[in-house]
Amino acid sequence: MSSMILTQFRPFIESISGITDQSNDVFEDAAKAFSMFTRSDVYKALDEIPFSDDAMLPIPPTIYTKPSHDSYYYIDALNRVRRKTYQGPDDVYVPNCSIVELLEPHETLTSYGRLSEAIENRAKDGDSQARIATTYGRIAESQARQIKAPLEKFVLALLVSEAGGSLYDPVLQKYDEIPDLSHNCPLWCFREICRHISGPLPDRAPYLYLSAGVFWLMSPRMTSAIPPLLSDLVNLAILQQTAGLDPSLVKLGVQICLHAAASSSYAWFILKTKSIFPQNTLHSMYESLEGGYCPNLEWLEPRSDYKFMYMGVMPLSTKYARSAPSNDKKARELGEKYGLSSVVSELRKRTKTYVKHDFASVRYIRDAMACTSGIFLVRTPTETVLQEYTQSPEIKVPIPQKDWTGPVGEIRILKDTTSSIARYLYRTWYLAAARMAAQPRTWDPLFQAIMRSQYVTARGGSGAALRESLYAINVSLPDFKGLPVKAATKIFQAAQLANLPFSHTSVAILADTSMGLRNQVQRRPRSIMPLNVPQQQVSAPHTLTADYINYHMNLSTTSGSAVIEKVIPLGVYASSPPNQSINIDISACDASITWDFFLSVIMAAIHEGVASGSIGKPFMGVPASIVNDESVVGVRAARPISGMQNMIQHLSKLYKRGFSYRVNDSFSPGNDFTHMTTTFPSGSTATSTEHTANNSTMMETFLTVWGPEHTDDPDVLRLMKSLTIQRNYVCQGDDGLMIIDGNTAGKVNSETIQKMLELISKYGEEFGWKYDIAYDGTAEYLKLYFIFGCRIPNLSRHPIVGKERANSSAEEPWPAILDQIMGIFFNGVHDGLQWQRWIRYSWALCCAFSRQRTMIGESVGYLQYPMWSFVYWGLPLVKVFGSDPWIFSWYMPTGDLGMYSWISLIRPLMTRWMVANGYATDRCSPVFGNADYRRCFNEIKLYQGYYMAQLPRNPTKSGRAAPREVREQFTQALSDYLMQNPELKSRVLRGRSEWEKYGAGIIHNPPSLFDVPHKWYLGAQEAATATREELAEMDETLMRARRHSYSSFSKLLEAYLLVKWRMCEAREPSVDLRLPLCAGIDPLNSDPFLKMVSVGPMLQSTRKYFAQTLFMAKTVSGLDVNAIDSALLRLRTLGADKKALTAQLLMVGLQESEADALAGKIMLQDVSTVQLARVVNLAVPDTWMSLDFDSMFKHHVKLLPKDGRHLNTDIPPRMGWLRAILRFLGAGMVMTATGVAVDIYLEDIHGGGRALGQRFMTWMRQEGRSA
């Protein structure tokens, strides 16, 4: 496919397709071409694609003719603009309506318009029709804004990268077989729809996404459904090419999107039909099974460590076919209801053809699931609140009033005599609270400071309402006038409250909370309740007790949102026969935890549980107090309570009353109201840990008490008896996974399981929980999917073009978008797209975003990142310096380690290339021989790209002038807040004076609690919006770095480059080559597949693994545990006295005896490679997290040369830490080379081990001096 319009990109296309060398000149020429390309040019290039018939399908004409919006809205009794629900109670998303009648044309782009100002002004004056029109106009605009950048940029990058044709895979020694763009149905649809909408108009783009907002094409065929539809089509078009999705499946996905656009609301239709692909593929696979292999993992004891051992493979046979009940009827009904019967029957027909579990069958599931829409769903804040915060649970068996004692302040105690199942809830929380309060560390001033600091962040926390509630009792707060910080942060709030007594701040516990919104993919939008500082403060005992339960009493996994932070092997184990898994999720969990059942019991349990361990003590700045005790009938007594109990009293008052939610809907003028809700607040520090604790506790009660009492079926009884929450039920928040271990006879009978599940559902109804249970032969946990031990990445949940924009704040200025673009690339790596296609597309995309026009003084200039910046950020080169193409893997690390790795792989080639191209010199360097590398790297902009990549991509706001005394008053207030306990301050002071004696001068700027107030101050500054000057300053800095000429890389990288390796033979595979472990990572996707089988999959929780590599697991927010760790390791490495380590630990708040003991341990302990490498800031790259990098460090990297010892490679006895750095360097090279991970042997250290060690030690001493 040669396009006339794309000819200017030809050299770039050849360089990213591995035909010619990549060079910065070619890259920057292409970047210029990208920036000159107009939107209409993109559509002209699309016109040139000769689409084949199989890419076409009928587009329903109804997507262009939509009714006016006014019949979809009304004004309710409280004078709020509301959405009329036609399709069902949740039909409150953006309606698919015409929009042209609301627009006024743009002054220069006359074909485009935006919501007319006249309408907005009438809306401000309260005119009903105008308020309705404005609401529709704004929310439709918000739906159109949920993208990272204009769609045309993503499309152009696709046209450019795919113009290179098929790619030659040097590992498989053949060209890939992904059909070209002429078979890309979503792209054809994109073109046709845009053509039809623009009709005779000269402009082809249906809408413009600009920093000023969204401008709509003034066409009668334009509707609010077009932007989300186009966004989905572009996503699918890109995925079809870069993941090699099956075009016939993608076509079914396109049909659903077109149906959504033809319906009365795009987002609502998508939400109702999102289960179609998983339901008819993943959840109905293998009804007959004739073969294949699944992993045989053993879950090592204790299970809570989440370590697994690979025991080989297990062949699958007929007896492991899907035994769960069929979902055929349910699936067909859904298809009929939404006019998608043909899609459903086509999918089911295809699913039945897979009777063997292998690479092809799991790829089919992955491809199908990738076809679900990936837009961020949007609805107005008003509707979100009224949908989410009006549900109250139906509790079938409430706790009888007589089972409670009389009041003790705000709580009542549950009597032992109660027959309610609440007694088990009470017992668990009571025990956990008692043990938590009995732990000495709970009372340690540092621990309390960590708790008090964890919510002091640059995020908002309903500050306005907090201030109002305090003004109401005549407490005035310092306003820190003239301070250049963002006031709507909890940092600012903490400073304001730092010196107020609890008797004042406690008033704010009942203050309103403001409103936050999160838009999500394939889920309804959530409202977030940002709690204020006093509210978070009194939630601490609730959080701590829940943490105790989750740490000591159940199998909870904590995890972040990134795939790499979740426990992947758990899903592999749970879904591999003969094990079976049941996915249990609690519907509307926040709404189901209310005072009526849960919170009243939990508050009483904690209040009583902590009583004996906390007598008279204050906690986290909350003093002891006295309450009225009427628990014994007819007797009124005054009862002294501790600080912790005082917190529970205040928290109970809040939970009992409910939260008063202040909704100020920026999309609907005049929709300002306060809503009382009993729903548990999603912004509390307790939310997640609290739900987890209740989830496991209620399951334990079911397995041990309620279940056995409600059945006499011997099989079900035996099954329940064999399950425990310490071994078989993993949960996090409202998400649970029940794992039924296979027995010697094989799988547990599915009818027995069915009976138990029916009991669980019935059980939940007693206390208002609706358990959503899926038992279908697959495991789904924390949005990860597994079948027969193979992970199915859900590509649709990582939309390439989509971005959550929940509020109307402006887009972040360039170059911040580059972080998002690199984020897209790394998502694709974790999701196992086709490695070559993905690297090529990512190069095109990065190039398209690498250049920006800017004002430099009075003149227009251009800022341009060289291609090398992207390499530094982790994008692997394709072919460079005359190398073969595709020799660099996407597992190449970022930063200095990555630079070291790719340079080391082709170092002799680079020298040859430089000399051949006239960069020769008489001086010989240990790294590049007789090449004049300094001149070369400056001329090809390698040095400039390297240094530009390390500069901030957001404007720095901490340089703003502030009145000195106000600034000092502010940091002093933060210091008072943090050091609220004088004992803590004296520890730090003592540490400081010890440091002067034993540590000064060894390392600079050791981390200390005294740094935290200033760090918080900087954080509150950085949260503010950048000014023009700050943007210009950032641009200027980038410009200077680009113009500068350099003489070397960083000191570290220069030292690394002195180390040479010899790559040797491949190892035996770590896992069976027939075993699908991750859909899409298979022999058709050579490099990721060979890495997976040669390095092996990660078989333990990465989070637990890294937690073991830290001396201090937790610290105050504002200090970094890694920084503390590396300071301690540097001290040890530089031969500091143990007393210096003790001083360092005192400065971060440890008590002396603890600091002393830990320092002794650090001096003697054997430290792991991953931990030691921190001394030079080396860390395991994210892309390695799914692989067994630990055994790679241990077994693939050999520090003894292949042919025996050399003087140069010997490590001096006192420099054992060097080994860790060397292992990282060797592993970096192994992982950066494509193909099988080989064994690598140390060959030479230029100048010897001792000299290298000394270079690193010098660097450690100097590091931090500039900071």
Curated annotation (Swiss-Prot):
Top-rank taxon: Viruses
Biological-process GO terms, alphabetical: viral genome replication
Its EC number(s): 2.7.7.48
Primary localization class, coarse: virion
GO cellular-component term (any): viral nucleocapsid
Catalysed conversion reaction: RNA(n) + a ribonucleoside 5'-triphosphate = RNA(n+1) + diphosphate
Disulfide bridge positions per record: none
Keywords associated with the record: Capsid protein, Nucleotide-binding, Nucleotidyltransferase, RNA-directed RNA polymerase, Transferase, Viral RNA replication, Virion
Domain RdRp catalytic positions: 555-792
Intracellular or extracellular location(s): Virion
MF terms in GO: nucleotide binding; RNA binding; RNA-directed RNA polymerase activity
Similarity comment text for this entry: Belongs to the reoviridae RNA-directed RNA polymerase family.
Function: RNA-directed RNA polymerase that is involved in transcription and genome replication. Following infection, it catalyzes the synthesis of fully conservative plus strands. After core assembly, which consists in recruitment of one capped plus-strand for each genomic segments and polymerase complexes, the polymerase switches mode and catalyzes the synthesis of complementary minus-strands.
Full protein name: RNA-directed RNA polymerase lambda-3
UniProt organism field: Reovirus type 1 (strain Lang)
Native organism taxonomy: Viruses, Riboviria, Orthornavirae, Duplornaviricota, Resentoviricetes
